[in-house]
């Protein structure tokens, strides 16, 4: 279980997160939605060790992760697929995926994980020798998903996974996320598009100005008229 309690964090002395309380149960999928500047991506930066909170407690399975380095957090099984592409464009697809297991020193284990990931993501096999830079944005996103699974993570954080995708690739990404859900992994995703993110989540959290405005099931949030002012076009169900 992931728990944040009274977390304040920000940049240059200005808090972006202002007393965040959040709980993500093991094996569930939770989506954070909200307008630009609400603090969605800042939550992920704090959880990945890239930003230290000024105040507050963060625990993962009962262990405090405040002050841990990104590498230490990765070793706990917490991985993130960032919003911007993070592949090495000059390396082949399969080698990019293999690098996801750089912390593992058991060659046989790495190869076994690679085979498992190839079954889940056919693109790792069909484009194995192609340079990652030759792939479309959506294809690169699929490869990034594959790479993040090489460490068999316990918590996967996705920062706007549907951003900039064509309809066909978007459908592939959604199916991939659902496959990861069925494997029992815990998923925390951030989405600008409320309907997209909440439709594939069990739970949702709405952030407004660095604070939790509403949390509950995706149906509760989509149908709540009180938060329509956060989005153009009225309520979240119309977003």
Give the label of every model feature segment:
Residues 2, 17-19:
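Conserved structural motif at the start of ABC-family nucleotide-binding domains
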Residues 12, 30, 68, 91-112, ...:
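ABC-type ATPase nucleotide-binding domains, specifically the catalytic core motifs of the NBD
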Residues 33-35:
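The feature captures the beta-strand-to-loop junction immediately N-terminal to the Walker
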Residues 48:
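Helix-to-loop junction immediately C-terminal to a conserved catalytic motif
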Residues 56-64, 76, 110-114, 216:
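Conserved ABC transporter NBD signature motif
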Residues 131-135:
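Conserved ABC ATPase signature
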Residues 148-149:
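ABC ATPase C-loop
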Residues 152:
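Conserved catalytic motifs of ABC-family nucleotide-binding domains
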């Amino acid at each position: 279980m992931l728990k944040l309690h009274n977390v304040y964090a920000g940049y240059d002395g200005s808090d972006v997160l202002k007393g965040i309380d959040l709980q993500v149960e093991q094996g569930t999928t939770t989506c954070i939605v909200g307008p630009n500047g609400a603090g969605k991506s800042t939550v992920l930066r704090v959880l990945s060790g890239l930003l230290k909170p000024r105040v507050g407690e963060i625990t993962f399975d009962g262990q405090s992760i405040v002050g841990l380095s990104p590498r230490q957090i990765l070793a706990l099984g917490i991985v993130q697929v960032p919003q911007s592409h993070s592949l090495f464009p000059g390396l082949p697809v399969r080698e990019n995926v293999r690098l996801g297991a750089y912390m593992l020193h058991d060659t046989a284990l790495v190869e076994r994980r690679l085979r498992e990931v190839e079954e889940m993501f056919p693109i790792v096999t069909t484009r194995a020798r192609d340079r990652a830079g030759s792939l479309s944005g959506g294809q690169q996103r699929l490869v990034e998903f594959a790479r993040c699974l090489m460490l068999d993570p316990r918590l996967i954080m996705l920062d706007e996974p549907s951003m900039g995708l064509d309809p066909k690739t978007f459908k592939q990404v959604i199916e991939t996320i659902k496959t990861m859900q069925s494997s029992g992994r815990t998923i925390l995703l951030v989405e600008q598009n409320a309907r997209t993110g909440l439709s594939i989540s069990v739970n949702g959290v709405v952030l407004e100005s660095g604070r939790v405005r509403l949390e509950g099931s995706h149906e509760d949030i989509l149908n709540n008229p009180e938060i329509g002012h956060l989005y153009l076009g009225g309520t979240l169900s119309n977003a």
